[in-house]
Amino acid sequence: MLLMVTTLAAYSQKTSLTTVNSVRPKRGDKMAFEAAYKQHIAKFHKEAQEKINVYEVLSGPYQGYYHLVNSGQSYEGLDKDRSDATAHDMDLDKTFYPLLDETMNGTYRFMDSLSIHSDVQAEKFVVNVRHIKPSLEADYRAESARSAKVQGKLKGGFWDNLSINVFEQLWDGNDPTVVSIRNLKEGFKSLETDFYGVASVGAPTFKDEYVKEYGTADWDKRVKLMDDAVVKHEQYIMKFRKDLSSQ
């Protein structure tokens, strides 16, 4: 299943939710879909609480999907209905859904303790979706928090520019899912080896700093856990579509 979200600043605990509608236009209807959605956005998604950001998947088995993202939500907000719900839904039924081949929905919670330099703004992204073994979910989260803490301390061109936002999918049954989004503020070109410069000779690596903080035995446990805990791993790149998003 496709699971994805957006780049976000660190929200407060009360507005840490993001809802995502992932859609795939029918073959041959890509441009018609974009035109119809622009009109829908202009009519129904102007207010702050209703604004939508749109992202287009550019690689992998979900290439051609769009993520329609409503971020900064709260649990309380999930109880509220739109005042224009009937007109909104009728517009979708008439101009939006007929152009789609598939649609999937999900709700995600931002994980500040697992994220690194989360306030970076970008328009290009690398997305990693990991499906976690339920029995190892708690251990995986704890270890991910450790890793983020160590990575946040590392210095140098690459580490100073590393920005990752992490989310957990809510209400995902027996398939715990963690989504990490690397924000590429310099674009896809920053994925080139040594784009931010070659590391200084003798500069501590992630492993060096981890072992310094937690010890060699814990490093060995980490390597095994991060491999054993992940049942399935998906990766793709995506870009922000400002032209399709709320203005």
PLM-predicted stretches and their roles:
Residues 1-15:
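Bacterial Sec-dependent N-terminal signal peptides
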Residues 12-247:
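Short S/T/G/P-rich N-terminal loop/turn motif that feeds into the first structured element of a domain
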